[in-house]
């Protein structure tokens, strides 16, 4: 009899879990793709629900993403395997929340904020909802100070400000992850929050161990939802990472938030929206995607005390402006770095296209001499690009254009300035000295 007691207690616990006073249970009436239609449950939009078997066993959780007449539309956080018409749906009366605290540093979480690094539960007593309002624009502090990154081309020519939101636009395979690793190691911040959305499973550990490194991980929180995870988890990863960054910002810290990538976040939102019955609009994206982008991106930036400086990567399909996500994000953020496949083919890294990239706040955070030197280098580089073909075929005549002559004489020094080994970081003062020497009297 005593041997059966643990089993009896487990059964009773399950039954009690299904008999909570005041709860109403819903029933799954239809499964359409990745969406559940549930009847008989009183829930609100964004509420988390539990999906349980009749004996009380928890199968998984889901979020309410819409309504259709008297039915609630739920997006499960995991696989649909095991669900049936006998599955009970229980609203928890709250949205998804994530644990926050100093114990998060050095940890790796999944897209729902659960630990996925095998190091056990996170010792945090505070939980915050992953959805929050952006700071009041009239209470935000101004962006007034540079935030050195250790990447020479960025610090010198498109200087990042503390609290700035910068986009990294690039095709696949031109060094986005490597550049993010350099930012994580070299940026002078207190905490890194790194969000990986839709990545290949192989790349996650490679990024953490080979690119980020042990020292970088020690002051970082990594949130990861790989490409095989559900669309709702991939989408929620962006909000989980942002909520964690907000927690540290609200405590007066300087936070670096890096999200790879916004494109995969938008695609996950598209899957959810289309499954819920939204009409497709630009390139198949429903209206909710374009509504969610500013809600997410405006949460970063300066706060009343701390700051969130953010990098968001965007998979740019082409340069014709036909990519609606790239176009929308470019209009929201405070600047953009364009990574070029042509520059990468020349073995020049970081493969940033200087003439196409821009920091919207650089002019208000750097001194006049710095701004002038950066402008001179851009002018020389633009002029050299104009005459490069003539130089290569031997048709350029020395003395025909004074600026072109200067650009040709200095192009090797300029290229040395623009290139940087991925395992080396450049001090901000050294970057400014080198920039001045390259452009002096130009």
From Swiss-Prot:
Segments forming a coiled coil: none
Encoding gene, per UniProt annotation: sctN
Protein's GO biological process: protein secretion by the type III secretion system; symbiont-mediated perturbation of host programmed cell death
Keywords, sorted A to Z: ATP-binding, Cytoplasm, Hypersensitive response elicitation, Nucleotide-binding, Protein transport, Translocase, Transport, Virulence
Function statement: ATPase component of the type III secretion system (T3SS), also called injectisome, which is used to inject bacterial effector proteins into eukaryotic host cells. Acts as a molecular motor to provide the energy that is required for the export of proteins. Required for type III secretion apparatus (T3SA) formation, proper protein secretion, host cell invasion and virulence. May play a critical role in T3SS substrate recognition, disassembly of the effector/chaperone complex and unfolding of the effector in an ATP-dependent manner prior to secretion.
GO molecular function, one term: protein-exporting ATPase activity
Protein name according to UniProt: Type 3 secretion system ATPase
Subcellular localization, as worded in the UniProt entry: Cytoplasm
